[in-house]
Amino acid sequence: MEILDTTLREGEQCYGVFFPIETKKKLACVLDEMGVDFIEVGHPAAAPSIRQAVVEIAALPLNSRLIAHARLDKAEIRMVRELGLAWVGLFSGINTLSLKRYGLTRREVYERISASVLYAKELGLSVRFTCEDASRTDRNELADLYGHLKELGADRLSYADTVGTDTPARIASLQKSLVGVLPFDTLHFHFHNDLGRAFPNAVTAIGLGAQCIDASILGIGERAGLVALEDLLAWSKNGGAGTKKIGCYRIEPLKLAQELVSESINRRHFEQRAFAHKSGLHIHGILQDPVSYEPVDPTLSGHHRAIVLSKLMGRAGLRSVLSRFGIEDNDRNLMRILDQIKSEEFLELAEAQEIGDYLEQFRSGISVPSGYRTHAGT
């Protein structure tokens, strides 16, 4: 069993969580001391502060393999190489929901995936490819994709239960679907916890021989998060069935890691995280079809959906927000505002009044009161 810790990437997509660069470096060192196999350091193209953090983490004398997120985009893939990393994490969905969101045919998406994997390999990068929303993807199409990418030279293949709808029984049936196509013990798994099944799904996958499980400190991540690293370590230390590396992870530094993460959480926001969307890619999907990233309609339980204005926001999400507040959203104005948002490391707004007040500066040219910038740890 291997562990990929994604606290620094997926964790920061959680509403209420921001890590200053120094905290990211400390967390990387602690995770390395714990012996995790991979540390996912972020999505460098998302914001300048993330790029800087990746540069500084890459300069540390760590034993864990560092991996960075990139879309199917040559510039983003090249950026990962230029920042000094050896591993890139590419991702894409191939199911009907994903194709609708991309506005592409399945063949066009396959071609983009293939071209991106080949380009990354040409640059000398090791490639992990994640099929987004794999749990809601036709098993035959999934098997075809994995088999094709293995032939192209992808080093690792990952299965993402993006909205947390999988069950242990479905994970067991997945193993049978991949017989003759891809050994189960070469797969990575990324389980979300929207329905409370991330940990049992992970345990099932490990028992069946999965190669690697994604986890994060305190289980933080987009919406309800994912597998908590501390749960995974405690389980393996207590003789979890199927683990090939029992006793090789150090659990002693865990308390410090938890403290570092806790200090970076805005508790008021964190408590509202289950239906909050912070990643630009997720916001784009939600705007097109909420089912893309919500397994349950939030209104059914008396909650409401929150679109978070932060450095992780993309053009589609911002265009929707600007339209909502009656601000001109032509390309020039959009990029001017987006550049400003991405430059503010700890900006995080989800309430209509806060967002409206913040956006007034782009209507009137006035400075925004400091109270509308939410700093980590407050």
Task: Name these PLM-found stretches.
Residues 1, 7, 241-378:
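A mid-to-C-terminal "edge-of-domain" accessory segment
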Residues 1-3, 38-40, 63-69, 85-89, ...:
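Structural preference for beta-strand elements that scaffold enzyme active sites
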Residues 1-72, 309:
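N-terminal capping/small domains of soluble enzymes
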Residues 11, 31, 88, 129, ...:
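Conserved, mostly hydrophobic/aromatic
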Residues 32, 38, 43, 63-128, ...:
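Active-site beta->alpha loop and helix N-cap motifs at the rims of alpha/beta catalytic domains
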Residues 36-61, 92-104, 132-133, 159-169, ...:
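Glycine-rich, proline-tolerant flexible connector loops at the mouths of alpha/beta enzymes
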Residues 47-71, 110-125, 171-189, 232-240:
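Alpha-helix-loop-beta-strand connector modules within alpha/beta enzyme cores
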Residues 163-292:
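Catalytic alpha/beta core domains of metabolic enzymes, predominantly
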